[in-house]
């Protein structure tokens, strides 16, 4: 979700009660990742949820971790940062992670919140990481979006 025109919503803690949530976070860009993780964990705490945090080396590893965790969790959230460099590596990583996470969600039926920042500069990532002075909190948004999706599917009987 983009900051401009983003919907305003908050999941209902009573409806979210008992959801098993996993947060998978890459380790690159420590300060930014700390902000994303804190935002996702705060959103979970606001809902009375205690997510399991799994750390993986990099953003590419988020996909396999999400696939395995989707076997036993109701909601999975992936968090990472990919900053554009001078080589096509950025494009390969962003495409593979986006496709992989989407495939995990569609194949398993488990909502996977996408909190992977794909940015041109580290400052753009900091602006979205929920750090002091940030304009956005993509960690919180990713967790809330995944929880809201799971709740909508349950209401629909899916």
From Swiss-Prot:
- Give me the Gene Ontology terms describing cellular component: cytosol; riboflavin synthase complex
Catalytic residues identified in the record? 89 (proton donor)
Q: Which terms does the record give in the GO molecular function aspect?
A: 6,7-dimethyl-8-ribityllumazine synthase activity
Catalysed reactions, semicolon-separated: (2S)-2-hydroxy-3-oxobutyl phosphate + 5-amino-6-(D-ribitylamino)uracil = 6,7-dimethyl-8-(1-D-ribityl)lumazine + phosphate + 2 H2O + H(+)
Mind telling me which Pfam families this protein's record contains? DMRL_synthase (PF00885)
Q: Which residues bind 5-amino-6-(D-ribitylamino)uracil?
A: 28, 59-61, 81-83, 114
Q: Please provide the record's keywords in A-Z order.
A: Riboflavin biosynthesis, Transferase
**Enzyme class per UniProt:** transferase
Name the InterPro entries on file. Answer: LS, LS/RS, LS/RS_sf
- GO annotations under biological process? riboflavin biosynthetic process
User: What intrachain disulfides are recorded?
Assistant: none
Q: EC number(s) per UniProt?
A: 2.5.1.78
Q: Where does the signal sequence lie?
A: none
User: Which NCBIfam families did the record assign?
Assistant: lumazine-synth
Give the protein's function: Catalyzes the formation of 6,7-dimethyl-8-ribityllumazine by condensation of 5-amino-6-(D-ribitylamino)uracil with 3,4-dihydroxy-2-butanone 4-phosphate. This is the penultimate step in the biosynthesis of riboflavin.
Q: Which protein is depicted?
A: 6,7-dimethyl-8-ribityllumazine synthase
State the species of origin: Micrococcus luteus (strain ATCC 4698 / DSM 20030 / JCM 1464 / CCM 169 / CCUG 5858 / IAM 1056 / NBRC 3333 / NCIMB 9278 / NCTC 2665 / VKM Ac-2230)
């Amino acid at each position: 979700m983009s900051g401009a025109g983003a919907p305003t919503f908050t999941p209902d803690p009573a409806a979210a009660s008992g959801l098993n949530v996993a947060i998978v976070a890459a380790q690159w860009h420590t300060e930014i990742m700390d902000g994303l993780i804190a935002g996702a964990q705060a959103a979970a705490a606001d809902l009375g949820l205690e997510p399991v945090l799994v750390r993986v080396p990099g953003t590419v590893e988020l996909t396999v971790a999400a696939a395995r965790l989707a076997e036993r969790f109701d909601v999975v959230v992936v968090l990472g940062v990919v900053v554009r460099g001078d080589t096509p590596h950025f494009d390969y990583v962003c495409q593979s992670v986006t496709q992989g996470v989407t495939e995990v969600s569609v194949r398993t039926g488990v909502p996977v919140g996408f909190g992977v920042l794909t940015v041109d500069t580290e400052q753009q990532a900091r602006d979205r990481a929920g750090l002091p002075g940030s304009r956005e909190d993509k960690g919180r948004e990713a967790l809330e979006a995944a929880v809201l999706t799971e709740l909508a599917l349950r209401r629909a009987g899916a």
